[in-house]
């Protein structure tokens, strides 16, 4: 955590966005991550959504309250606004609830029933400012047929989940992402213009404690 905080201190920042999997599904690191969260809040406001790891926790509601209590803006299909340098920023944080391992299989074989997020995008549409959607799953930007997020009116989607494809092969690219499978399109980088999708490779490793040609990253958006 010291390395991450040191790097953050070198970056000019107004907001910190966390797109899920902040605490793993065994919750063994909760006390450390709460302490780390307090350090983040000393540096900038934190806007947070859940990932598949948090959603698998039995004490999910308790954890959400603890994160809110330390000062995180916990967004569970909710909007929030903040003014930075006289500019209004509007967040929509999505709680997509695609956490079960059986969900991964269903998504791969095309039988998964995605949640209808249109009501939340309709709420976002009523608000002004620069609109940022926080979504754990980058593939939902374009891969969910009639429910894909890119059809809606917003500026930027920030996502994670794919760990950069875990392994990146020279001349081939990212190898695997849960939910996308082999050679995923949305593993890292930027896609589109407006709306634009930025996929972070993130800082953690989850079940596979190894990366190959795939450095962890903190994404800086100007």
What kind of feature is each model-predicted range?
Residues 1-2, 22-31, 54-61, 98-112, ...:
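Acidic/histidine-rich helix-loop elements
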Residues 1-75:
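Membrane-embedded segments
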Residues 10-11, 37-43, 124-127, 147-152:
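Short, conserved loop/helix-junction motifs that constitute active-site signature segments
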Residues 15-21, 45-52, 75-78, 132-135, ...:
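Active-site neighborhood of phospho(di)ester-bond hydrolases with catalytic His/Asp-centered motifs
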Residues 22-25, 52-56, 80-82, 96-100, ...:
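Solvent-exposed loop/turn segments at secondary-structure junctions
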Residues 65, 138-219:
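Conserved beta-sheet core of the metallophosphoesterase superfamily
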Residues 69-72, 84-134, 141-148, 211:
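Binuclear metal-dependent hydrolase catalytic cores centered on His/Asp/Glu-rich metal-binding motifs
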Residues 78-85, 187-193:
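Short acidic-hydrophobic surface loop/beta-edge motif
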């Amino acid at each position: 955590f010291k390395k991450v905080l040191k790097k953050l201190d070198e970056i000019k920042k107004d907001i910190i966005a966390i797109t899920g999997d902040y605490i793993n599904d065994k919750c063994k690191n909760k006390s450390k991550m709460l302490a780390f969260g307090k350090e983040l809040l000393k540096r900038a406001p934190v806007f947070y959504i859940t990932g598949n790891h948090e959603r698998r926790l039995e004490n999910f509601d308790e954890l959400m309250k603890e994160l809110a209590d330390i000062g995180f803006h916990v967004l569970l299909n909710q909007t929030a606004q903040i003014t930075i340098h006289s500019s209004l920023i509007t967040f929509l944080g999505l709680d997509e609830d695609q956490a079960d391992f059986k969900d991964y299989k269903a998504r791969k074989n095309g039988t998964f029933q995605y949640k209808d997020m249109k009501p939340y995008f309709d709420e976002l549409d009523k608000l002004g400012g620069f609109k940022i959607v926080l979504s754990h799953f980058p593939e939902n930007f374009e891969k969910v047929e009639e429910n894909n997020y890119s059809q809606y009116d917003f500026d930027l989607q920030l996502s994670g989940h794919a760990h950069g494809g875990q392994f990146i092969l020279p001349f081939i690219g990212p190898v695997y992402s849960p939910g996308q499978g082999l050679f995923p399109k949305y593993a890292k980088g930027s896609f589109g213009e407006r709306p634009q999708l930025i996929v972070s490779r993130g800082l953690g490793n989850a079940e596979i404690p190894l990366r190959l040609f795939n450095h962890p990253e903190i994404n800086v958006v100007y």
